[in-house]
Amino acid sequence: GFASMALCCLLIDTMYKFEHGSNATNYNELKYEEMLMTYMNDVFSSLDVARAFYKGIRCGILHSGETQSGCMLSVTCNHIIEVKGNGLDTKINVNVIDFSNRVIQYINDYINRLYMDNIQTRKKFIKKMNYLCDRKSFIED
């Protein structure tokens, strides 16, 4: 579950950069939470839940190799995310399988926006791809 969730968190990080045409390697907690509430608002219906995910799941797993702040991973909970508490005391239990499927759905939705001639999405995609393709190789001829 931890490896799958780590990959989901990295995919969300990457998709943020494609959604915004961003070359930046760092962005802040608020932008991540905004991304979750904008593109997966069926799962992240409040800032409290998005913040708990960012701090307790994403940062916990990617920076410490564990969930934090009372947040947990599961394969048996009945919803993608079960929420307990509110505000700074919000704790979540994330169903790894369902969440992974939701991230895949989000990526497919993004691909569909590219196919559907969404000009802004395409411009930002091109900007990000140009940045990736223009990087100089570390290998000298």
Where in this protein do the model-derived segments appear?
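Amphipathic, Lys/Arg-enriched alpha-helical patches that create a basic surface
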Residues: 74-141
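A structural signal for well-ordered alpha-helical segments within the folded catalytic domains
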Residues: 6-9, 13, 30, 52, ...
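Histidine-centered, metal-coordinating catalytic motifs and their short helical/loop contexts
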Residues: 47-74
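Anionic, Ser/Thr-rich low-complexity intrinsically disordered regions
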Residues: 15, 20-28, 46, 68-75, ...
